[in-house]
């Protein structure tokens, strides 16, 4: 290579001539056993160098140069870019390419408030030594470029403001395993930790985002999704919104069972007021979901569930579509429609489905989930009761609307509540 003339700004502020031979060695190392051209990456990167360039920017330029060469004809550039990205990531996290000892790493980041202090209390120094010896840091080099960017952007512990990363992927996998099995019997837990670590680090199983990004941090978020049962009172509705904010900030996805909320026009306090219906409260939930991100990893997300026989179902099914106005749409949540055998039978037999406000038929709502025979008996009983507000709609028409909105939005889910309860491990 030609004698360099450009100056490089080091991390401590010093300037020195650019070392193109060092850059060549790094790219050659990353290109080992790959069908790529080292010189092509060098040429593509060098035209972007400038006098006074920082060393971190040189690394970023090399990564981008390799990533720009990824194509169907030359897919190996995705692994070259990934290896360069891992090299850069480790330099930022550890100040060097070689990762530190697991115990030293956890101690340092616990002192900085990045890791859960329980890690140091739950495991002995001897256990840390055994787990450190089991780490296979070479697996960091098996990722494709897109995977490294996903890890860097979402999953690795970092300062979400400055974007400084504090760990490498193998530490992520090992520490998640250590947190999940911390309270298993001491005599056997290391075998569980190691089996889990090897399974996730070799991509045999995958983990949900909240577990990967939060389980080893002080927030101690062990659940990826949280289900919230919403009642029909203002206290319950506001408690639901409060729980949404708390758990979204803790990185959890949200499921809201909002089927108990009474329909629009229902009496409140024996007719003292008239109910505004589900939609204003769904908007309240949407605001709660979107007011914080999932621990800085991604925006909050929620799915709201309601029964197909809810009196407002025709208005609820269209909440996500692009027609209508903001007042009658709640587009930034997903929806789950709850069905059972009775609903399907009405469809097959080309009969009507009768809609009720759950507040008017509370025992019907409870039986919908708990006792299908009881539900069928009560459903027929309330259909014949002239004192209860209701609306009959052809089952074919209602199912048609549901499937049309499901096809158009792709974000309306179907929950067969009777099937769920007979095939679930939960009581």
Task: Tell me what each language-model feature is.
Residues 1-427:
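Extended catalytic cores of very large enzyme megasubunits
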């Amino acid at each position: 290579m030609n004698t360099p003339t450009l100056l490089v700004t080091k991390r401590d502020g010093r300037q020195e001539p650019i070392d193109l031979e060092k850059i060549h060695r790094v790219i050659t190392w990353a290109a080992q056993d790959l069908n790529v051209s080292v010189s092509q990456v060098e040429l593509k990167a060098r035209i972007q160098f400038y006098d006074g360039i920082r060393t971190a920017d040189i690394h970023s330029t090399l990564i981008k140069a390799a990533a720009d060469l990824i194509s169907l004809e030359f897919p190996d550039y995705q692994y070259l870019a990934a290896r360069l990205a891992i090299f850069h990531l480790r330099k930022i996290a550890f100040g060097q390419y070689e990762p530190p000892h697991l115990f030293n790493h956890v101690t340092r980041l616990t002192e900085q408030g990045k890791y859960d202090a329980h890690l140091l209390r739950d495991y002995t120094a001897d256990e840390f030594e055994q787990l450190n010896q089991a780490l296979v840091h070479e697996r960091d080099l098996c990722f494709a470029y897109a995977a490294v960017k996903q890890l860097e952007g979402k999953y690795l512990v970092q300062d979400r403001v400055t974007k400084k990363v504090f760990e490498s992927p193998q530490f992520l996998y090992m520490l998640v395993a250590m947190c999940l099995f911390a309270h298993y019997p001491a005599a056997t837990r290391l075998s569980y930790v190691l089996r889990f670590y090897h399974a996730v680090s070799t991509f045999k199983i995958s983990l949900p985002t909240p577990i990967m990004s939060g389980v080893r941090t002080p927030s101690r978020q062990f659940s990826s999704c949280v289900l919230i049962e919403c009642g029909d009172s203002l206290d319950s509705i506001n408690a639901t919104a409060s729980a949404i904010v708390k758990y979204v900030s803790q990185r959890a996805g949200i499921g809201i069972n909002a089927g108990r909320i009474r329909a629009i026009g229902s009496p409140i306090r024996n007719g003292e007021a008239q109910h505004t219906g589900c939609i204003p409260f769904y908007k309240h939930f949407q605001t709660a979901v979107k007011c914080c991100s999932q621990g800085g990893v991604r925006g909050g997300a929620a799915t709201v569930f309601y029964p197909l026989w809810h009196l407002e179902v025709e208005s609820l099914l269209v909440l996500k579509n692009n027609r209508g106005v903001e007042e009658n749409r709640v587009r930034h949540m997903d929806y789950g429609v709850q069905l059972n055998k009775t609903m399907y039978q009405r469809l097959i037999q080309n009969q009507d489905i009768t809609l009720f406000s759950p507040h008017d038929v509370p025992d019907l709502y409870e039986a919908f989930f708990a006792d299908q025979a009881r539900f069928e008996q009560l459903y027929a009983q309330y259909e014949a009761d002239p004192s209860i507000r209701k609306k009959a709609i052809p089952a074919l028409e209602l199912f048609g609307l549901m499937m049309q909105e499901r096809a158009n939005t792709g974000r309306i889910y179907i929950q067969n509540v009777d099937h769920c309860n007979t095939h679930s491990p939960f009581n």
